[in-house]
């Protein structure tokens, strides 16, 4: 290490982990399947920085992937395992902006990637408070994108889904399945029987398009034209 520059961050999307230099060693951050939501009822009042029981079995596939990619990682041993909570929202985006129903109360939280968006979020929030509106369209992170449909069971299912999707490919306009269908109109079943392929907006199921004869009633996400193009 002596005389060498600091190692850059490594990311392996297939094995779903990142690795970077930390205090003279390497830190491995895996994003595993099946990570359970915690603090659904909120943390205790005296909770500050609580760590949970180590669970190396759950991390084994990611550790094996890291050793395959960086063989030296398998030779140095594990000094410490941190298993703690990380803040997530149902869609994985932070929550920045004015709170529902409260005057002069602003929210800036849900930053699951740490300080990455700190500068931009602080900048836009300051403009919002001082000037009355932000320079950038903040609709994607607005607290008001969630309504009273976002119950605790909904939040649990969607937060677990958002965490498990961090390292997979994200397609344009994809509609994720957890906690759905949640709110449906009286004609939902009729539209479904007519071939509707549904999306979700503000908790409501609504048709994105209707599958034609012989077409599977399911979207196939793509960076090009998916099957909705032929139907429409």
Regions found by a protein language model. Name each.
Residues 1-11, 136, 140-145:
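Glycine-rich loop(s) and the adjacent beta-strand/alpha-helix scaffold that form part
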Residues 2-104:
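Active-site lid/adjacent beta-loop-alpha segment flanking the redox-cofactor pocket in flavoenzymes
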Residues 24, 33-34, 101, 112-114, ...:
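Short, glycine-/Ser/Thr-/acidic-enriched flexible segments
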Residues 68-75, 127-134, 146, 196:
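Generic secondary-structure signature for well-ordered alpha-helical cores
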Residues 117-139:
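Internal hydrophobic alpha-helix adjacent to the cofactor/substrate pocket in enzyme cavities
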Residues 106-109:
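Short pre-catalytic strand/loop immediately N-terminal to key active-site residues, enriched for Gly-Thr
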Residues 49-56, 111, 115, 177-181:
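Hydrophobic alpha-helical scaffolding
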Residues 136-137, 143-232:
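Glycine/proline-enriched, intrinsically flexible loops and inter-domain linkers
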């Amino acid at each position: 290490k002596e005389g060498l520059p600091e190692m850059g961050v490594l990311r392996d999307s297939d094995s779903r982990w990142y690795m970077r230099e930390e205090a003279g060693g390497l830190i491995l951050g895996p994003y595993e399947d099946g990570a359970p939501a915690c603090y659904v009822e909120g943390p205790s009042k005296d909770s500050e920085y609580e760590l949970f029981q180590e669970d190396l079995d759950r991390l084994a596939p990611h550790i094996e992937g890291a050793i395959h990619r960086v063989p030296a990682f398998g030779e140095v041993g594990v000094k410490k395992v941190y298993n703690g909570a990380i803040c997530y929202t149902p869609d994985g985006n932070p929550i920045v902006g004015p709170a529902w129903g409260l005057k002069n109360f602003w929210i800036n939280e849900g930053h699951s990637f740490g300080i990455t968006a700190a500068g931009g979020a602080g900048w836009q929030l300051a403009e919002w408070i001082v000037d009355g509106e932000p320079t950038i369209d903040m609709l994607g992170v607005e607290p008001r994108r969630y309504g009273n449909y976002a119950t605790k069971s909904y939040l649990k299912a969607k937060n677990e889904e958002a965490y498990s999707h961090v390292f997979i490919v994200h397609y344009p306009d994809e509609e994720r399945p957890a906690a759905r269908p949640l709110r449906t109109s009286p004609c939902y079943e009729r539209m479904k029987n007519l071939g509707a392929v549904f999306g979700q907006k503000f908790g409501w199921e609504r048709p994105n398009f209707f599958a034609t004869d012989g077409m599977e009633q399911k979207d196939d996400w793509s960076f090009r034209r998916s099957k909705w193009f032929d139907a429409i």
